[in-house]
């Protein structure tokens, strides 16, 4: 190793630690010195070590940073094959590390083009105008300042800093223009004691509990307080990759969410980057935590201090980051005490998004995962208990809100204690629930104390990561694993080892779902804070912190944020639509469920939800907290409200229905987990689609009202309302389930009936007599039973079954009754079968129809025995009618027979054929006939039989002159149809077959009705049937049957279905209803869709 000359090229810290040594490149004429964590060195070699530039052996002239004009320094490969400084990647928010652990390659694809268009004012001041426009510039982290400069230029000018947002976990990588940097220095000096103390405390806490990162630990061990920034730098090296990513992501989010963006962006980017190296989360977490710390220091200053300064100044602390942190702390604590932490915590708010993010992660790490698991459950049972912890959490949060460097430690320890006292009142609700346990909060704090730096830093990093990642994920896709980001956010499994693991596991789960999940939650927090402005941001971030701290990990928070977000149009919508909607939606629901499951048990849903909603500004955090804590129940109701509004629309959404239904069922049980899934489902649904969100609008409105009420301290009422909404949602779910069951049962019954009806009935020889009288029929059903009744019954089912019944009744592909062209053979056949019985029962008029329709011999019989059975049964009284019906059924296909038979009472046997034809009439006809040619053959045979039967009828003395006329016309029509059928048969297609069948049946029908009405038009036929029935009396039944047959033929595209459908109409018409034209054959298909009359 070379002798140590100068500091780290990344963090500028000259110190090295055993856990995070300063490594020097052994390349020729290379002066690169970096901390292991700052450069992403997984393992420092015992022999010579070479930086990536020297390792690549590329000519120095070809190695230049794509983000700045400088060629020297610690460079790494970029995703596009170029090179970039690690420090440039850390300080430019949109730059990410594909692998946070190794901090390479550097991902530049998300850097907006306008960054490359900015010019460096430092280069211009120093006379390097030619280089001023090269690379990508960062902007002064001071809110409102538009000065742009290269990262390396600012580094050389000493304008970069790492602001520790949450003492331990995260570091904000901040850079300021000279003017604002000097102001930041003065403000830091003024609040330096508090900030430094807090930072130092945080550092030592991080060191103690920070098995996380040697750098961190050593930093905390080493004069982290006195040299917070240096250890920060050192850790920043490690955390930087993470922080860098977090910062980038945070900045990325920063843009969307402006208030938290300032604070959160650094954190998120860091977390993002940490997340990027999720795989090496542990090491990176160590390094990231250090980096986080330093990054937080620097970025916190940059983002936190900058944004906080901006906001903090706006709020109350215009001082430097330190003072800001202090101000934030005091503001938070005072806010907490005052009960307006959200509003008074504007300054804390600014830091809050950042810090909030920290607490968020930190809490989940230390408290939430260690404690919330246990405390959370207790929290759910006792909302008030969780509330005090919430206050603590919030205090933490507030403290976290305060700048990490200043407030970080104090926040965790003294600040949190101080803020806690006031916090409980103000944030109590949100935080307690969020924490899910006062112990959790406190413990978290202590845990932070023990390993606060890692935990706090980690949470912040995680949060930043989350926020940035969420935004990035939502924008760019799933991105890095949430879990790793969370882990890293956790600051590595080291400090919050257990919490970290839990958080990692939990958060991993949550994170994954978060795809914007944790990000979303943090992002939401950020968004909400930005959206809501200083007061909004603070609460939002605070809530965020509590969310994580609340033992709700991001995942929960995210869903809630969704819910809440939906409620909160700005916060939730942006997040849910951009983050959750795209990548996180599905993941969120899925993972969220598991998180919910695990979180719900630990915490009560009601409080969480309530608190979530209570905090209008902090919808996200609170929801998360609540969700994880007791509030789950409350959230559920809230969600259920949203869900109930969504329920019907959402049910249409498969994913929602599947998720929502079972979760809703669970909700029925009122299990917190169930509630959570429901909440998640709704949340997911809402983010997923605008439609879902719209459905949730009513719920959202209520939820928003609930949030407002909760914000006003009416959490209890909100809980009740949410529970009511949940209850209503559960009831709706039960009702729908019952409906499904009933429909299923009906379907089964119809199927059974169909099978029964498929069995051919004995043919009734006395067709005419039967026609004259009610059809004692094969079914022996009373003629009074109306086919319309059967239709209505089949139609009565609201579900598709009813449709199927209608279809089956109408046998034709287009259900005359339903007017629906649905063609479900099984459904049709089933349903058609039951209707036929009622039809048979319907009346003698029906029989007459059947009789005229059944004149065809039993050609249908060959077709499943339905044709002949329908002929015999349907025509029961009238063999000729049977033949006709059989002919129709045969020609139309079994469906016709079945329907006609069923309708006429002669169709008793037909149902079987119907069922066969029931499917798509087209398919079924072939099924019944076994082939188009076979069907055609049957049609021809049936037509011949029908002609014979009609001739017999004409010869029969029973026929009156009117009947004879009708029969004669029918014979003519049958002959005409034969020609049409032959032509159609030539087509050989099933549909043509159906139309042929329809055609064949039509001639019969038209033959029956021609005397009264033109056979050509189905409507005339039906009216004719009606007229015929009255005029013929008993004979009318024959005429009616003929008319019905004609109507049927006219009605259905596939004759079989058509015939069946029409028979109902015809039957009613014969009885005097004058079914009106149902439709025509396939040829007369238009009429099929006409009114039933």
UniProtKB/Swiss-Prot annotation:
It comes from the Eukaryota. Residues 191-212 have a biased composition (Gly residues). Residues 345-354, 804-813 have a biased composition (Polar residues). The modification Phosphothreonine is found at residue 451. Transmembrane segments: none annotated. It is found in: Nucleus. The keyword Nucleotide-binding does not apply. One of its GO terms (biological process) is regulation of transcription by RNA polymerase II. Pfam families: PHD_2 (PF13831), zf-HC5HC2H_2 (PF13832). The modification Phosphoserine is found at residues 258, 378, 423. Residues 317-340, 410-425, 787-796, 818-832, 839-853 have a biased composition (Low complexity). One of its GO terms (cellular component) is nucleus. Residues 258-268, 374-388 have a biased composition (Pro residues). A zinc finger (C2HC pre-PHD-type) spans 62-95. Residues 729-764 are annotated as: Leucine-zipper. It is linked to A chromosomal aberration involving MLLT6 is associated with acute leukemias. Translocation t(11;17)(q23;q21) with KMT2A/MLL1. The result is a rogue activator protein. This is Protein AF-17. It comes from Homo sapiens (Human). The gene is MLLT6.
């Amino acid at each position: 190793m070379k002798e140590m000359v100068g500091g780290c090229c990344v963090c500028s810290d000259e110190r090295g630690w055993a856990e995070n040594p300063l490594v020097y490149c052994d390349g020729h004429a290379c002066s690169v010195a970096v901390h292991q964590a700052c450069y992403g060195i997984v393992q420092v070699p015992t022999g010579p070590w070479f930086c990536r530039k020297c390792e690549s052996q590329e000519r120095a002239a070809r190695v230049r940073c794509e983000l700045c004009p400088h060629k020297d320094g610690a460079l790494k490969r970029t995703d596009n094959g170029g090179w970039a400084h690690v420090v440039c990647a850390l300080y430019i928010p949109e730059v990410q590390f594909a692998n946070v652990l190794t901090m390479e390659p550097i991902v530049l694809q998300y850097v907006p083009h306008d960054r490359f268009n900015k010019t460096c004012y430092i280069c211009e001041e120093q006379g390097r105008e030619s280089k001023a426009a090269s690379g990508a510039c960062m902007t002064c982290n001071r809110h409102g300042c538009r000065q742009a400069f290269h990262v390396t230029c600012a580094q050389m000018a000493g304008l970069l800093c790492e602001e520790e947002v949450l003492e331990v976990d995260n570091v904000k990588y901040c850079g300021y223009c000279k003017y604002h940097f000097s102001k930041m220095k003065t403000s830091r000096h003024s609040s330096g004691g508090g900030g430094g103390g807090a930072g130092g405390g945080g550092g030592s806490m991080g060191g103690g509990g920070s098995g996380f990162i040697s750098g961190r630990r050593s930093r905390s061990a080493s004069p982290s307080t006195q040299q917070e920034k240096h250890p920060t730098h050192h850790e920043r090296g490690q955390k930087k990759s993470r922080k860098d990513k977090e910062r980038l992501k945070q900045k990325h989010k920063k843009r969307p969410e402006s208030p938290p963006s300032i604070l959160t962006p650094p954190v998120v980017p860091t977390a993002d980057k940490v997340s990027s190296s999720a795989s090496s989360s542990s090491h990176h977490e160590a390094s990231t935590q250090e980096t986080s710390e330093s990054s937080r220091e620097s970025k916190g200053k940059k983002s936190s201090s900058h944004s906080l300064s901006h906001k903090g100044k706006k709020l109350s602390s215009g001082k430097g980051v330190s003072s800001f942190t202090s101000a934030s702390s005091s503001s938070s604590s005072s806010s907490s005490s005052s009960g307006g932490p959200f509003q008074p915590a504007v300054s804390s708010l600014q830091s809050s998004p950042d810090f909030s993010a920290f607490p968020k992660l930190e809490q989940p790490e230390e408290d939430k995962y260690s404690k919330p698991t246990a405390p959370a459950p207790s929290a759910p049972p006792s909302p008030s208990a969780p509330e005090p912890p919430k206050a603590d959490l919030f205090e933490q949060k507030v403290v976290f809100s305060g700048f990490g460097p200043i407030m970080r430690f104090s926040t965790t320890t003294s600040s949190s204690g101080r803020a806690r006292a006031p916090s409980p009142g103000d944030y109590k609700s949100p935080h307690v629930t969020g924490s899910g346990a006062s112990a959790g909060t406190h413990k978290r704090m202590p845990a932070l104390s023990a390993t606060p730096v890692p935990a706090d830093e980690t949470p912040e990093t995680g949060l930043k990561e989350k926020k940035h990642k969420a935004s990035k994920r939502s924008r760019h896709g799933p991105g890095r694993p949430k879990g790793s980001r969370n882990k890293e956010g956790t600051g590595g499994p080291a400090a919050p080892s257990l919490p970290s693991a839990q958080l990692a596991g939990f958060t991993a789960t949550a994170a994954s779902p978060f795809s914007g999940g944790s990000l979303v939650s943090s992002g939401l927090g950020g968004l909400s804070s930005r959206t809501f402005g200083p007061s909004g941001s603070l609460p939002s971030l605070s809530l965020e912190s509590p969310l994580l701290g609340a033992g709700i990990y991001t995942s929960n928070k995210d869903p809630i944020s969704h819910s809440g977000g939906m409620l909160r149009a700005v916060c939730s919508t942006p997040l849910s639509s951009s983050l959750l909607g795209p990548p996180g939606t599905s993941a969120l629901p899925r993972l969220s469920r598991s998180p919910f499951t695990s979180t719900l048990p630990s915490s009560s849903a009601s409080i969480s939800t309530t608190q979530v909603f209570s905090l209008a500004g902090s919808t996200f955090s609170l929801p998360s907290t609540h969700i994880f804590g007791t509030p789950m129940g409350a959230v559920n109701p809230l969600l259920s409200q949203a869900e109930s509004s969504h329920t019907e629309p959402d049910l249409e959404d498969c994913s929602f229905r599947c998720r929502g239904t079972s979760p809703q069922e669970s909700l029925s049980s009122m299990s917190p987990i169930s509630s959570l899934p429901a909440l998640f489902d709704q949340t997911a649904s809402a983010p997923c689609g605008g439609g879902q969100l719209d459905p949730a609008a009513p719920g959202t409105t209520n939820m928003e009202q609930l949030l407002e009420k909760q914000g006003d301290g009416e959490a209890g009422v909100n809980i009740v309302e949410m529970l009511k909404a949940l209850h209503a949602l559960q009831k709706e779910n039960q009702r729908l389930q019952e409906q499904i069951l009933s429909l299923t049962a009906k379907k089964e019954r119809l199927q059974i009936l169909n099978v029964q009806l498929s069995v051919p009935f004995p043919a009734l020889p006395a067709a005419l007599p039967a026609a004259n009288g009610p059809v004692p029929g094969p079914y022996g059903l009373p003629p009074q039973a109306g086919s319309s009744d059967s239709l209505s019954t089949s139609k009565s089912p609201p579900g598709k079954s009813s449709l199927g019944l209608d279809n089956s009744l109408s046998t034709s592909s287009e259900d005359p009754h339903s007017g629906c062209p649905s063609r479900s053979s099984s459904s049709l056949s089933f349903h058609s079968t039951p209707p036929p019985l009622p039809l048979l029962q319907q009346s003698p008029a029906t029989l007459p129809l059947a009789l005229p329709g059944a004149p065809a011999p039993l050609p249908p019989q060959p077709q499943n025995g339905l044709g002949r059975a329908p002929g015999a049964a349907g025509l029961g009284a009238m063999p000729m009618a049977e033949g006709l019906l059989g002919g129709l059924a045969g020609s139309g296909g079994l469906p016709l027979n079945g329907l006609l038979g069923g309708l006429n009472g002669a169709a008793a046997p037909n149902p079987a054929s119907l069922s066969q034809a029931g499917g798509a009439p087209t398919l079924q006809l072939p099924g019944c006939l076994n082939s188009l040619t076979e069907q055609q053959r049957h049609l021809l045979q049936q037509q011949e039989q029908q002609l014979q039967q009609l001739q017999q009828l004409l010869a029969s003395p029973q026929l009156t002159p009117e009947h004879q006329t009708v029969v004669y016309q029918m014979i003519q029509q049958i002959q005409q149809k034969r020609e049409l059928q032959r032509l159609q048969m030539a087509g050989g297609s099933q549909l043509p077959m159906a139309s042929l069948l329809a055609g064949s049946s039509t001639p019969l029908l038209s033959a029956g009705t021609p005397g009264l009405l033109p056979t050509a038009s189905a409507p005339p036929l039906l009216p004719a049937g009606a007229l015929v029935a009255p005029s013929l009396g008993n004979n009318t039944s024959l005429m009616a049957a003929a008319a019905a047959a004609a109507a049927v033929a006219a009605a259905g595209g596939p004759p079989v279905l058509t015939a069946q459908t029409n028979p109902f109409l015809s039957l009613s018409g014969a009885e005097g209803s004058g079914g009106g034209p149902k439709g025509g054959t396939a040829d007369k298909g238009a009429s099929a869709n006409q009114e039933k009359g």
